[in-house]
Structures are given as C-alpha cells and as structure tokens.
Swiss-Prot record:
Name of the protein in its database record: Paired box protein Pax-9
UniProt GO molecular function: DNA-binding transcription factor activity, RNA polymerase II-specific; RNA polymerase II cis-regulatory region sequence-specific DNA binding
Entry's localization field: Nucleus
Species of the source: Saguinus oedipus
Residue span of region PAI subdomain: 7-63
Keyword RNA-binding found: no
Source organism superkingdom: Eukaryota
GO cellular component terms listed in the entry, alphabetical order: nucleus
Main subcellular location of this protein, as a coarse class: nucleus
Residue ranges, annotated region (Interaction with KDM5B): 168-189
Stretches the record annotates as RED subdomain: 82-130
Length: 341
C-alpha cells in the first residue's frame, strides 16, 4: 500500500521525498520488466517516475537485488589491533618513516592484502591519534637521558651577597695581624636589594659606605649629616685668621702693591666684632661728587664715630685687597660730574 502522506508526482503517484520506494512496488517493477513491458509503460501503469523505474531495473540487472541502500554494505574495518601494532613497531624503528612506506611494508610483510590494507590517510590518522603521543614521550625520555644534570642553584642565605663594587673593594682590605682569617664568603659585606628610598635610588648610601671602607679616617654618612653642627668642627689655630693661614697672607702682602694715596694695613679683625651695616642714606643720583676720595667717603651718614674713612666699621683692611670698587666709584664720579656740566 502507498503511504497516506507525501507528495504527488507528475503522473499522479504519491511519494515521500528522501525515502526509498516501498519494496512491493520495487518487486512489481521487476516482474513487469520480466514480462517484456517497456519501462515507460511500467512508469505510466504504476504511476512511478521514469527515472526511478530505470534505476531500480539497472541495479537489479547488476546485483540481482531490489533492496535499497549501498550495495554490499560498508567496507570492513582495516585498522585492526594487529595492524596498529605493526604500524607502531615500524614507527619506533624508524621515526622518520612516511605513511606510504608503512603501507608498502604492510603489504610486503603479509600483514594485509590489497583488499584490506589501510589507505595512506588512515595510516596518517593512526600515527597522529594513537602513536603520536607515544613517539613524543619516547623522544622526550631519550632527550632527558642525554641531557646533563642541572647545576645546583646558589644558596640564598645570610652568607650570600649580591655582586657589587663594594664587595670587590672589601676583598682588597687586608686582614690585620693577629686576627684569624675569615673565609671570603663570610667576609663579603652584605648588601640587600635596593629599596625605593631616595638614598638607595641615587646610590648615596653605597658611595658613602665605599668611602668609609676605603678611607682610614672617619667619614660621616648621610644619616649623620643632620646631627652635625658648627660646634663639632675643631677651632682654628691661633696663628690662623678666619680659617686661613696668616703666614700665607703675609707672604702675599709682600708682593702686593697698595693703591695710591691709601695706607697699608696688615692686621685682621674677626667677623664677630664687626657691627651690622645700617641702612644707607638716600642720595640723589644727580648730586655732584668731588673727585677726592675723602669727599664721598666722609659724607656718609652711617660712618662710625671711632672709625677712619677707609674703615667705617672700626676694623682694619688688609693691604693685599685691591680697592677696585673705590676706583670704579671714583671714575663714576668723574663721569657724573662731566655729564652734569
């Protein structure tokens, strides 16, 4: 019986798209063909398409079967465990062997015949999926056997220190006599990794430490600079004035010439005995000054009562000093006088 659902072809017959023709109709087509009826007449009589009738009759003449589907069924399995074992053996003996060479060896060794030998693509798939991991593991094991033993890592403890120029400088310091020698690993100064402080970033601490290690005298570090005051410095010697050697200054005064019209004074007064400068009097820039030095030196209102025109603060001026400022003022007074005239 024909199914109650489907589509109607051009002859009025009903069929289901994608489904094979029922076996009863197939058998009827073959019987009518054996009676000598033409395929076109069978198609009109059974209301089946001409192409379907021709295909069924052609398959029956070739195979003798009216059943649908692939003729002879699927191909039997060729990748048997025995074949896989032989392929693994070939690959282990020669890791660089090709798939087509394995196929030829399977035929030469009689493992397979020309009907059940696997194809080149099947052998490649077996090598990739089933034997590839084993080959890589064997290669890795052989590589580990030939690989030399790794060197032991350096111990990181309180004895180990980072290489730095300070360690090289400390290694050159000889050991004092009478003191037992210390091994080099213990004698090296310990320098920890640099922190994020300003002194460590700029390298000030390492520089001061290196100077203190190489110098026989005590050198204060950066941390000690803030605690140092003027009281910590030694006082000047009696024969030194303001931190300078008096003998050297007197030697310079022998070869220096005093300015014309100015007396030579050879003594010094400490800065603590000098009075502070009072506020200078306002002087008009258009006033006319005399060319004589005593004219503009004695005219200032801030001159001390017991001082001389050359030393208004009651202190002596060394003869080695050149009165360039007074000479410049003297020349400036001449220019102002000339411009005013």
């Amino acid at each position: 019986m024909e199914p109650a659902f489907g589509e109607v072809n051009q002859l009025g017959g009903v069929f289901v798209n994608g489904r094979p023709l029922p076996n009863a109709i197939r058998l009827r087509i073959v019987e009518l063909a054996q009676l000598g009826i033409r395929p076109c007449d069978i198609s009109r009589q059974l209301r089946v398409s001409h192409g379907c009738v021709s295909k069924i009759l052609a398959r029956y003449n070739e195979t003798g079967s009216i059943l649908p589907g692939a003729i002879g069924g699927s191909k039997p399995r060729v990748t048997t465990p025995t074949v896989v074992k032989h392929i693994r053996t070939y690959k282990q003996r020669d890791p660089g062997i090709f798939a087509w060479e394995i196929r030829d060896r399977l035929l030469a060794d009689g493992v397979c015949d020309k009907y059940n030998v696997p194809s080149v693509s099947s052998i490649s798939r077996i090598l990739r999926n089933k034997i590839g991991n084993l080959a890589q593991q064997a290669h890795y094991d052989s590589y580990k056997q030939h690989q030399p033993a790794p060197q032991p890592a350096l111990p990181y403890n309180h004895i180990y220190s980072y290489p730095s120029p300070i360690t090289a400088a400390a290694a050159k310091v000889p050991t004092p006599p009478g003191v037992p020698a210390i091994p080099g690993s213990v004698a090296m100064p310990r320098t920890w990794p640099s922190s994020h402080s300003v002194t460590d970033i700029l390298g000030i601490r390492s520089i001061t430490d290196q100077v203190s290690d190489s110098s026989p005298y005590h050198s204060p570090k950066v941390e000690e600079w803030s605690s140092l005051g003027r009281n910590n410095f030694p006082a000047a010697a009696p024969h030194a004035v303001n931190g300078l050697e008096k003998g050297a200054l007197e030697q310079e005064t022998k070869y220096s010439q005093a300015p014309n019209g100015l007396p030579a004074v050879g003594s010094f007064v400490s800065a603590s005995s000098m009075a502070p400068y009072p506020t200078p009097a306002q002087v008009s820039p258009y006033m006319t000054y005399s060319a004589a030095p005593s004219g503009y030196v004695a005219g200032h209102g801030w001159q001390h009562a017991g001082s001389t025109p050359l030393s208004p603060h009651n202190c002596d001026i060394p003869a080695s000093l050149a009165f360039k400022g007074m000479q410049a003022a003297r020349e400036g007074s001449h220019s102002v006088t000339a411009s005013a005239l």
